[in-house]
A protein has these predicted regions:
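A solvent-exposed, acidic/Ser-Thr-rich amphipathic alpha-helical stretch
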Residues: 6-8, 26-79, 83-86
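Short, low-complexity N-terminal intrinsically disordered segments enriched in polar/charged residues
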Residues: 1-35, 139-145
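Low-complexity, intrinsically disordered terminal/linker segments enriched in charged
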Residues: 120-145
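Polar/charged side chains located within well-ordered beta-strands of beta-rich proteins
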Residues: 10, 14, 81, 109-111, ...
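Short coil/turn motifs at secondary-structure junctions
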Residues: 86-90, 116, 126-128
Length: 145
């Protein structure tokens, strides 16, 4: 597939992810995620069904999430995107009870595309920044008394 076609697939994934966060309909992602998807993210299970469960849980924790695509670069069968998401922490997330905090987090993804679907996805979110904004990890210069 041409680079522009692959970029369109990733753009569609981002649109569908927004739908998942709003509605919980993870099966909508089957349009762009291959059944044999391999997902790479620190601490995350690598298979499609586990990834879908994670996205559903994420949507419950951050139901007002909005995604802003900052950059997208394609070459060969890979598409890289850098995005920023903003959301309010309204439900449990990774064992952290809702804080009501408004978050801004950046992520970079590398996606490998074959036959019109994402077959492999590497995610590198700013987990330290996320945990600091949730109050799970102190920000630099902050200390517990």
């Amino acid at each position: 597939m041409a680079a522009e076609e692959n970029k369109a697939i990733l753009q569609r994934f981002n649109e569908l992810a927004g739908e998942v966060f709003r509605t919980g309909n993870v099966d909508a992602l089957d349009e762009v995620l291959a059944p044999e998807l391999v997902y790479h993210q620190p601490g995350a299970p690598p298979d499609l069904e586990s990834y879908k469960r994670f996205l559903a849980m994420f949507g419950l924790a951050f139901p007002d999430v909005s995604l802003t695509l900052e950059d997208m670069i394609a070459e060969g069968d890979k598409v890289v995107d850098r995005l920023t998401w903003q959301a309010t922490h309204q439900g449990p997330f990774m064992g952290i009870p809702p804080t009501g905090n408004r978050l801004t987090v950046t992520e970079i993804h590398i996606n490998r595309i074959a036959e019109g679907r994402i077959v492999e996805r590497w995610a590198q979110p700013d987990l330290l920044g996320l945990m600091q904004q949730l109050g799970a990890v102190p920000a630099p210069g902050q200390h517990d008394s």
